[in-house]
Amino acid sequence: MKVRASVKAICKDCKIVKRSGVVRVICANPKHKQRQG
């Protein structure tokens, strides 16, 4: 899980999701998981 000020989709499998006010990236590749913070 990477915590970043700006989250971006890295590959075509990355999906940007907003969960309870937090922007997250979910992906098949665990290295691409991100959270805004």
UniProtKB/Swiss-Prot annotation:
Keywords, alphabetical: Ribonucleoprotein, Ribosomal protein
Domain of life: Bacteria
Biological processes annotated in GO: translation
One term of GO molecular function: structural constituent of ribosome
Pfam families registered for this protein in UniProt: Ribosomal_L36
HAMAP family to which the protein is assigned, alphabetical: Ribosomal_bL36
Name of this chain's protein: Large ribosomal subunit protein bL36
Gene: rpmJ
